[in-house]
Amino acid sequence: MADRRIPGTAEENLQKSSGGVPGQNTGGQEARPNYHCQLCFLRSLGIDYLDASLRKKNKQRLKAIQQGRQPQYLL
């Protein structure tokens, strides 16, 4: 009964849904695209976890890239 509870976090969701033997297709799972990181996975679901300060840094980073400069922030 404990296994039927709703996972509390996205990470827990990922762990529960990624079962199976690595490198073998079990037939029950469709091939999933590989994501760079958990944030990329969440973005693919349409979930944006960036808070306001990170959004500002991301905007500054994109602007720097468009102007041909090396961005100050990696995210």
From Swiss-Prot:
Region RNA-binding (TAR): start-end pairs: 55-75
One Gene Ontology MF term: RNA-binding transcription regulator activity
Gene Ontology CC annotation, any one: host cell nucleolus
GO process terms (BP): positive regulation of viral transcription
Annotated spans, Core: 35-49
Locations listed in the record: Host nucleus, Host nucleolus
Annotated signal peptide: none
Top-level taxon of origin: Viruses
Keyword terms of this UniProt record: Activator, Host nucleus, Host-virus interaction, RNA-binding, Transcription, Transcription regulation
Annotated region described as Disordered, given as residue ranges: 1-30
Chain ranges for the short sequence motif Nuclear localization signal as given in the UniProt record: 55-63
Chief location: host cell
Family as reported in the entry's similarity comment: Belongs to the lentiviruses Tat family.
Subunit structure, interactors included: Binds to equine CCNT1. Participates in the formation of a complex composed at least of Tat, P-TEFb, TAR RNA, RNA Pol II.
Function as written in the Swiss-Prot or TrEMBL entry: Nuclear transcriptional activator of viral gene expression, that is essential for viral transcription from the LTR promoter and replication. Acts as a sequence-specific molecular adapter, directing components of the cellular transcription machinery to the viral RNA to enhance transcription by the RNA polymerase II (RNA pol II) complex, thereby increasing the level of full-length transcripts. Tat associates with the CCNT1/cyclin-T1 component of the P-TEFb complex (CDK9 and CCNT1), which promotes RNA chain elongation.
Name used for this protein in its record: Protein Tat
Organism: Equine infectious anemia virus (strain Wyoming)
Phylogenetic classification of the source organism: Viruses, Riboviria, Pararnavirae, Artverviricota, Revtraviricetes
Gene: tat
